[in-house]
């Protein structure tokens, strides 16, 4: 146990040395939606210089692809929302802070929570840019040009306007990874391990979106006979991406640097992680109590479930500190009836319910 905390302390010390490097993030585009004034369409420099959180390489990409920036922000926002959904019942609930770091100091620790955040954010950008291509919102891409799947029935048409996953993947890789690739760290340093970790998890997020995409089809024919189908490539619902990466979070691999400056698994008895797995280099901090040095917001004041034995239960969520009970009034729709034709009319019902919050 003592060695675990010594490892965490060393990681924290190392991470604080790179505060300036990690303090700004492109994730901030999610918090401040990008608006592109008409006057900036020709001259990109004013717009890109005003966007907080971009690295030098990302600013150059912004100048070349400024119409993409809105969708990078949308992708980051999608990733953050999905992160908060997946961790809504955990001590760390992917909460954001009111500055351009978005998540605060907690991202300076190379924990499995950081691994998930990087992966889901990168996935969000692939998702948003791929859809924007299909919708004709971007000047450099259009509908998907993916090859016809070999197992598609011969009499089905391959066409339509699919999500441009190939373009979304390539652009997300170029933009999101730019910050990591332009860093120069001493071989074998903690910072170099974080860079390798971030790049690996970014790729895992992108691959998840790519691998979960599937063929969608529309029927054609007399009276809905479906004698002919037109098919195209379609992204999976982003909830599936979040569910998949959450499973990878639960089984994430603990890594360390070897003498050659490569990440290797701490426990060599396990199979090495694949490009679809998440990796981390630091143990998670204590999320039970508020700690400004680690970025933990603690669980005081969090709602908990008195009857649950899971992570959302009061015993685990409150870390044994106990909980307070209070009553609240909830209003919801009730006694709904369908009226011909065609609407549903409901009444509003109120009830007093017990809620529990951690001390």
Swiss-Prot record:
Lipid-carrying residues in chain (O-palmitoleoyl serine): 223
A cellular component term from Gene Ontology for this protein is: extracellular space
Instruction: Tell me which residues are glycosylated.
Output: 93, 99, 291, 305
Classification via InterPro entries: Wnt (IPR005817), Wnt_C (IPR043158), Wnt_CS (IPR018161)
Query: After translation, how is this protein modified?
Result: Palmitoleoylation is required for efficient binding to frizzled receptors. Depalmitoleoylation leads to Wnt signaling pathway inhibition.
Q: Where does it primarily localize? A: secreted
Which Cys residues form disulphide pairs? Answer: 83-94, 133-141, 143-161, 217-231, 219-226, 288-319, 304-314, 318-358, 334-349, 336-346, 341-342
> So which domain of life are we looking at?
Eukaryota
Stretch forming the signal peptide: 1-20
Q: Name one GO biological process term.
A: neuron differentiation
Q: What does this protein do?
A: Ligand for members of the frizzled family of seven transmembrane receptors. Can activate or inhibit canonical Wnt signaling, depending on receptor context. Required during embryogenesis for extension of the primary anterior-posterior axis.
Q: Which family is this sequence assigned to?
A: Belongs to the Wnt family.
This chain belongs to the protein called Protein Wnt-5a
Q: Which organism is it from?
A: Pleurodeles waltl
Q: Which gene encodes it?
A: WNT5A
């Amino acid at each position: 146990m003592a060695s675990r905390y010594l490892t965490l302390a060393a990681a924290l010390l190392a991470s604080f040395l790179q505060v300036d490097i990690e303090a700004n993030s492109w994730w901030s585009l999610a918090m401040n939606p990008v608006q592109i004034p008409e006057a900036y369409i020709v001259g990109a420099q004013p717009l890109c210089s005003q966007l907080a959180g971009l690295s030098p390489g990302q600013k150059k990409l912004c100048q070349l692809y400024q119409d993409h920036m809105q969708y990078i922000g949308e992708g980051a926002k999608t990733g953050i929302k999905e992160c908060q959904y997946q961790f809504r019942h955990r001590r760390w609930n992917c909460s954001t802070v009111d500055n351009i770091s978005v998540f605060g100091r907690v991202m300076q620790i190379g924990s499995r929570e950081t691994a998930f955040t990087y992966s889901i954010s990168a996935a969000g950008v692939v998702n948003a840019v791929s859809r924007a291509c299909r919708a004709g919102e971007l000047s450099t891409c259009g509908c998907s040009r993916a090859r016809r799947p070999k197992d598609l029935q011969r009499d089905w048409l391959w066409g339509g306007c699919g999500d441009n996953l190939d373009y979304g993947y390539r652009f997300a890789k170029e933009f999101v990874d730019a910050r990591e690739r332009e860093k120069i760290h001493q071989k074998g340093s903690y910072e170099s391990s974080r860079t390798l970790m971030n790049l690996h998890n970014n790729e895992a997020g992108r691959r998840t979106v790519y691998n979960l995409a599937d063929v969608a089809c529309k029927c054609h024919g007399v009276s809905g006979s479906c004698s002919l189908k037109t098919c195209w490539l379609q992204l999976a619902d982003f909830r599936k991406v979040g569910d998949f990466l959450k499973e990878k979070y639960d089984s994430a691999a603990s890594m360390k640097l070897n003498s050659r400056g490569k990440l290797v698994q701490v426990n060599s008895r396990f199979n090495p992680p694949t490009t679809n797995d998440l990796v981390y280099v630091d143990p998670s901090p204590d999320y039970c109590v508020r700690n400004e040095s680690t970025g933990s917001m603690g669980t005081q004041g969090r709602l908990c479930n008195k009857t649950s034995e899971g992570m959302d239960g009061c015993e685990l969520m409150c870390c044994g500190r106990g909980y307070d009970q209070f009553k609240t009034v909830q209003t919801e729709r009730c006694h709904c009836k369908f009226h011909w034709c065609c609407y549903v009319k409901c009444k509003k019902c109120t009830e007093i319910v017990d809620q529990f919050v951690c001390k």
